[in-house]
Amino acid sequence: MKSKVFFTPVKDAEDIDAVNAGLKLLLAKSGVPAVAEAGRKVVVKLHFGEEDTDSFVRPAHLRLICDEIAAKGALPFLSDANTLYRGKRLNSEEHLGVALEHGFTKDAVGVDIFIPDDT
Protein backbone atom coordinates (compact mmCIF):
# COMPACT_ATOMS: atom_id res chain seq x y z
CA MET A 1 0.00 0.00 0.00
CA LYS A 2 1.36 3.40 -0.95
CA SER A 3 1.50 6.10 1.68
CA LYS A 4 0.00 9.51 1.04
CA VAL A 5 2.54 12.30 1.00
CA PHE A 6 1.37 15.84 1.72
CA PHE A 7 3.44 18.71 0.33
CA THR A 8 3.21 22.45 0.10
CA PRO A 9 5.91 24.59 -1.52
CA VAL A 10 7.70 27.17 0.60
CA LYS A 11 9.26 30.19 -1.07
CA ASP A 12 10.84 31.68 2.04
CA ALA A 13 11.51 29.29 4.92
CA GLU A 14 12.18 32.26 7.18
CA ASP A 15 8.61 33.57 6.71
CA ILE A 16 7.12 31.80 9.72
CA ASP A 17 3.55 32.94 8.98
CA ALA A 18 3.68 31.70 5.37
CA VAL A 19 5.15 28.35 6.38
CA ASN A 20 2.58 27.96 9.16
CA ALA A 21 -0.27 28.76 6.75
CA GLY A 22 0.87 25.90 4.52
CA LEU A 23 1.43 23.66 7.53
CA LYS A 24 -2.07 24.35 8.85
CA LEU A 25 -3.50 23.37 5.46
CA LEU A 26 -1.43 20.17 5.45
CA LEU A 27 -2.59 19.28 8.94
CA ALA A 28 -6.23 19.78 7.93
CA LYS A 29 -5.88 17.69 4.77
CA SER A 30 -3.95 14.91 6.52
CA GLY A 31 -6.44 14.60 9.36
CA VAL A 32 -3.62 14.05 11.85
CA PRO A 33 -5.04 16.28 14.62
CA ALA A 34 -8.41 14.51 14.30
CA VAL A 35 -7.00 11.29 15.76
CA ALA A 36 -6.10 13.07 19.01
CA GLU A 37 -8.54 12.13 21.77
CA ALA A 38 -9.59 14.57 24.48
CA GLY A 39 -7.71 14.00 27.72
CA ARG A 40 -5.11 11.69 26.11
CA LYS A 41 -1.39 12.44 25.95
CA VAL A 42 -0.01 12.76 22.42
CA VAL A 43 3.70 12.59 21.73
CA VAL A 44 4.99 14.77 18.92
CA LYS A 45 8.23 13.03 17.97
CA LEU A 46 10.83 15.21 16.33
CA HIS A 47 14.55 15.80 15.98
CA PHE A 48 15.72 18.74 18.10
CA GLY A 49 18.84 19.14 15.97
CA GLU A 50 22.50 18.60 16.67
CA GLU A 51 24.65 21.05 18.60
CA ASP A 52 25.76 24.03 16.49
CA THR A 53 23.37 23.27 13.60
CA ASP A 54 20.12 24.73 12.33
CA SER A 55 18.78 21.65 10.54
CA PHE A 56 15.61 21.07 12.52
CA VAL A 57 11.95 22.08 12.35
CA ARG A 58 11.53 25.51 13.91
CA PRO A 59 9.80 25.79 17.31
CA ALA A 60 7.14 28.12 15.82
CA HIS A 61 6.02 25.32 13.50
CA LEU A 62 5.88 22.84 16.37
CA ARG A 63 3.80 25.36 18.31
CA LEU A 64 1.19 25.30 15.54
CA ILE A 65 1.11 21.49 15.48
CA CYS A 66 0.79 21.25 19.26
CA ASP A 67 -1.91 23.95 19.32
CA GLU A 68 -3.93 22.04 16.70
CA ILE A 69 -3.68 18.84 18.78
CA ALA A 70 -4.53 20.68 22.01
CA ALA A 71 -7.58 22.22 20.31
CA LYS A 72 -8.99 18.67 20.19
CA GLY A 73 -8.63 18.47 23.98
CA ALA A 74 -5.57 16.23 23.87
CA LEU A 75 -2.36 16.86 25.81
CA PRO A 76 0.57 17.10 23.38
CA PHE A 77 4.23 17.05 24.37
CA LEU A 78 7.50 16.97 22.43
CA SER A 79 9.96 14.09 22.54
CA ASP A 80 13.08 12.78 20.86
CA ALA A 81 15.27 9.73 21.39
CA ASN A 82 18.86 9.90 22.59
CA THR A 83 21.56 8.85 20.15
CA LEU A 84 24.03 5.98 20.31
CA TYR A 85 26.87 8.06 18.91
CA ARG A 86 28.90 10.55 20.92
CA GLY A 87 27.61 14.08 21.21
CA LYS A 88 25.23 16.13 23.29
CA ARG A 89 22.25 13.99 22.35
CA LEU A 90 23.85 10.91 23.93
CA ASN A 91 22.20 11.53 27.31
CA SER A 92 18.89 13.08 28.30
CA GLU A 93 20.26 16.00 30.30
CA GLU A 94 22.53 17.36 27.57
CA HIS A 95 19.96 16.48 24.92
CA LEU A 96 17.41 18.67 26.68
CA GLY A 97 20.04 21.42 26.80
CA VAL A 98 20.42 21.25 23.00
CA ALA A 99 16.63 21.42 22.61
CA LEU A 100 16.47 24.52 24.81
CA GLU A 101 19.41 26.14 23.00
CA HIS A 102 17.52 25.64 19.75
CA GLY A 103 14.49 27.46 21.14
CA PHE A 104 12.28 24.56 22.16
CA THR A 105 11.18 26.21 25.41
CA LYS A 106 7.72 25.84 26.93
CA ASP A 107 7.10 29.52 26.19
CA ALA A 108 7.93 28.95 22.52
CA VAL A 109 6.13 25.66 21.88
CA GLY A 110 3.44 25.77 24.56
CA VAL A 111 4.04 22.21 25.76
CA ASP A 112 6.47 20.18 27.85
CA ILE A 113 9.46 18.31 26.49
CA PHE A 114 10.16 14.74 27.58
CA ILE A 115 13.33 12.88 26.64
CA PRO A 116 13.28 9.30 27.97
CA ASP A 117 15.97 8.17 30.39
CA ASP A 118 19.32 6.92 29.21
CA THR A 119 18.70 3.41 30.52
Residue ranges and their predicted role:
Residues 1-119:
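N-terminal and secondary-structure boundary signal
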